[in-house]
Structures are given as structure tokens and as C-alpha cells.
């Protein structure tokens, strides 16, 4: 079967690229760039360069790495070892699915969209208002996610253009009507702008999300006629490039918006929520509050839809005795329950969880890309690099949980940082692992064929199977 031409390949990848952009652009992506723009002052360029590197390029690389395995995160994790191949995907899917991210995005939509509109209409915040919001939001997300084979069409064709139009309106009017403000860079934005931008990019959670969305992307491309491994990788790169370009443009627009919006910014400010609210209300008045709410709802809804479908696809793959729709319903029920606890309760687990999982995920992606260049299949490199990153990442997680003893001990070396201290040791471990693989012959010896397994059918069934 012949593969599509270059022009048709772009046309095939466009809807999937729009879908991927919409899935990535969640609440976290919306609230951080304005803060970076306002807090960076004259350090705007290095701060945004760091943010785009980790918030755009790294998720793109992760999606491509997932496509090279042909098995999603399950296939990548199994290269480290069978136990890791079971535990790591489950932990990632739980964190980005029912136990954290879906509930978080639901409550963020309430805090930034539903609640301000209700207050505009004279209603006050209450548990009942949160319950109604969560019920409607989860109901709509569940309804869309029930048909993952049409996910690209529904998300890419309708929600993404609406989201982009609303963002263009808010950013355009604010930039044109508001004069630029002279602000000095504050706190870490002044002392270490590039690293601060890199760290802020981590907070989007898009690297973890990319390990999940990769399955949805590959399934969408397969349904559109790209079947060979080479065509799938090429289609993934094209789709990811489209999503990355849109993300970069939106991030820069929101960051510029932050430079032109009045608001009190200190080193302790955590997000750009107030900046966005001020921009909407000051430039568009009452209607601006409604437009801002619509942007947040669309951003959160598209993310929730993708996370629900991806979790159900993974769970159906792991436990095929339970149908896709039942897995989806179970995820929605758990997320519904947690979301009604409120945003503050949910965010308490965010820091330690991210610091623990991010080093594992980034190290796994890095070795996978090196492995793609090797004639054979790396073995020691996976174990050395991922294990080192995970151990040191656990130190950061413990610190985020409130115990800084191990971190202080490592800080005496003068080489440790809670946010990025694991990177250099992991790279050194990767080098050691590659040397060991070269000496053992694994670098140049093709991996033996593996017997068919449920994991090897992950891509085919994860997001497309329904019973």
C-alpha cells in the first residue's frame, strides 16, 4: 500500500495537529505565560526561550519518542525492565488521569471561569455551585470522550478554532489598546532567567501529558491512512510541529499581554490569573470577563476530553475484560469525586508528584531518542539513566513534600538544585550506560523479535477500541 504524498501527508496531519494543540493547551498553559511576561522585565527573551524549550519543544520530542516505539509509554517503559514497564505507565496515567489532572483541570475551570461569571451575575461561591459545575463539566467531557475515533474531528474542527479565536481577540485587543509597561525583572527572573523559564515550563505538565497523548495521536493518524512505522513517525512529527507552532505563538502572545497588563507582581506570585482577569475586564469590560471564562472553559474541556479518552484506552489495554466505556465511566466518577473536594485540596499533592515523575519521564525519553540512533537496542543505558534520574528526582519530591534533609546534604556538594540537580548525574549515567552497551555488543546487535503481547497491540486498541 503506497503512502500519502508530502502534500497529502500534511493534510492528513493537520487535523491531528490541531487536536494535539487543543489537548496540550490546558489551564496551566494559560496562566503561566502572562506571569512570565510581567515578571521578566528586560529578561523577557531568555525567560521565554526557557519556557518554550520545556513547554513546547520537550513535549514535541516526547510525542515523537513515543511514536518511535510503536507501543506508547508502555513500550518505552518496558525497555527499562518488566517491573518498571508496569509501574511507570500506571503511575503516569493515574497522575494525568483520575487521581489528579482531570480533577485539577475541572476545578481550575471553576475557579477561573464559572466562579467569576457567577459573581458577575450576583451569585456567591458555594459548594452547590462547585457541584453543579463539576457535574456539567464532567458530563460534557465524558460525552465527547465516548467516541475517541471521532476525537480529532470533534476537538480539532470545532473546539480548537473557537479557542484560537477567543485567544486572538483577548490578546489582540489588550496589546493594541494597552501601552507597554516598564517593569524590572523580579526575583529569580532577574537572577537566573533562563533556568526560571525552564522550570516554569515543567509546570505545564505537558511532558507527562505527551506520553499519554502520543497514543491518541498515533491512533488518529492510523485512521487517516498512515500505517507504516516510517509514515507514522513522519505524521507524528508533522502533527507535533503544527501543535508546537501554535503553542509557541499563543505563549508569546500571552506573555506580551502580561507585559501590557497592570497588576501587582511579586516574587511570590505563582500564576498569571489576576493578570488575565485584569486584561479581560480593563480592555473588554463586562464582556471581557465572559470571554475570559470561555477561553478557560475551552482550554480545560479539551484537555479533560483527551485525558479521559487516554486513560480509558490505557485501562482497556491493561484490563481488556472491562470495556472501554466502563473504564471511561469509572475514570469520570473518580475525577468527579475528587474535583468536588476543591482546588486547594487537589493541589497539595501536585508538587511532590511532579518532582517524582518528571525525571523518570524525561530520562526515559532521552534514552529512547539515543536508542533510535543505535543499530541495536540499548539496555544498560536505560537502566543507568532512568534509575539515576528517579533516585535524585525522589529527593526533590521529598523536599517538595516538606522534608529537606536529603536535599541539604546534596547541596553541600555545590552542584545540587532541587529543580534541575538530577539532570547532570542522569546524563553521566546515560554515558556510562552507552559505554557498557557498546562493550557488551547491545549497541550494534539488533534486538531479537519479541512474541506478540497485549502491549504490542497498545496503539491499535488504546484509544480506538470500544465494546
Which positions does each model-derived feature cover?
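Select transmembrane alpha-helical segments in multipass membrane proteins
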Residues: 9-20, 45, 82-96, 131-135, ...
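Membrane-interface loop-to-helix entry segments
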Residues: 144-174, 240, 350-362, 381-391
